[in-house]
């Protein structure tokens, strides 16, 4: 049976779940309820088998040797690059850089800014109070090294960074805005297209952390108008250790790579008794050494899988799960939502339970085969007293293979935890 021939969304999800081995195995006599998809997604068979096929049948390094295995591997790499280009509607495959993940992509550009001497002293970078540490610390480090100023845009009562909040922070010294499309703590969605127009208006670089966005919402870098965009494969069905960095043509020409080695130069020569080199064009100049070939091949299969079921289906299913999950949690008097219940969420619900620490809930739920996330979700600034004013929370995050039945079982488990630990 073909997925597209199935009419009912419930039946579609049942059909898709068969593709995920980990969802069809019992652990301690229980099937896992996996509600930690914001951390990483599970992997379908086609992704898993693509890696086995590569290592068994054409394992070789890429863009170097001329034998058939190397040629086949290189073709697969460039095929995936083209697929990613279409996935985010980039201008060219040359704008697509393979990284080890979102964090690596952000650090790559932060260090490239430094090596390229892009900023002047006292220039400003705008971040937000809802950023993951990975979209905070590289910029803080850059600011410390280059004597820059960091400004933080605050979220409103709906957990959103408004374009107006961004614009009021802009001065003639503002050179970069870095913001997440969907934040990993609340799951709220920022208006990137409006923020992109503001960045263009003031001739400011726009950097987008799309780690939570890429698995759930169609990305169009042309509509956003961003100069950079990063995401990780492992949150959208692909293996760990593979990510994407999109760089606009303009910025690819301006920046020097901070990571040099094989594949990054066209020529090395001696001039005035000094060794010099001519850097390769993008993407090569940003991809030093041997890439994660198996990861890239797995990413190709992951994108094919998502394209087949469509982002429209994923978005609609996310919406149904969020609405149902919020409704069921509202029935529990002990549950306190972060900010409020009416947030425009994508795939994440965060809350606390009165008088019970979230880590205790997480641990107890794990004994029932329910995977969640507790703590500060690697977004420490968000938890400051002037922001969320929380020490911890419990986060549940969905993907298209999750079901309302799983939410029902989660609620039963949570009720048991509350009864036992209150």
From Swiss-Prot:
Is the keyword Transmembrane helix assigned to this protein?
A: no
Give the UniProt keywords, A-Z. Answer: Pyridoxal phosphate, Transferase
Under catalytic activity, the entry for this protein gives:
(sulfur carrier)-H + L-cysteine = (sulfur carrier)-SH + L-alanine
Q: Which domain of life is it from?
A: Bacteria
Classification via InterPro entries? Aminotrans_V_dom (IPR000192), Aminotrans_V_PyrdxlP_BS (IPR020578), Cys_dSase_SufS (IPR010970), Cysteine_dSase (IPR016454), PyrdxlP-dep_Trfase (IPR015424), PyrdxlP-dep_Trfase_major (IPR015421), PyrdxlP-dep_Trfase_small (IPR015422)
Q: In its UniProt record, which GO terms are filed under biological process?
A: cysteine metabolic process
Give GO cellular component annotations, separated by semicolons. Answer: cytosol
- In the Enzyme Commission scheme, what number(s) does this protein have? 2.8.1.7
* Molecular function terms, GO-annotated: cysteine desulfurase activity; pyridoxal phosphate binding
Q: What does this protein do?
A: Catalyzes the removal of elemental sulfur and selenium atoms from L-cysteine, L-cystine, L-selenocysteine, and L-selenocystine to produce L-alanine.
Family the UniProt entry places it in: Belongs to the class-V pyridoxal-phosphate-dependent aminotransferase family. Csd subfamily.
Per its UniProt record, what PANTHER family does this chain match? CYSTEINE DESULFURASE (PTHR43586), CYSTEINE DESULFURASE 1, CHLOROPLASTIC (PTHR43586:SF8)
* Protein name (database record): Probable cysteine desulfurase
Organism name: Borreliella burgdorferi (strain ATCC 35210 / DSM 4680 / CIP 102532 / B31) (Borrelia burgdorferi)
What is this organism's lineage? Bacteria, Pseudomonadati, Spirochaetota, Spirochaetia, Spirochaetales
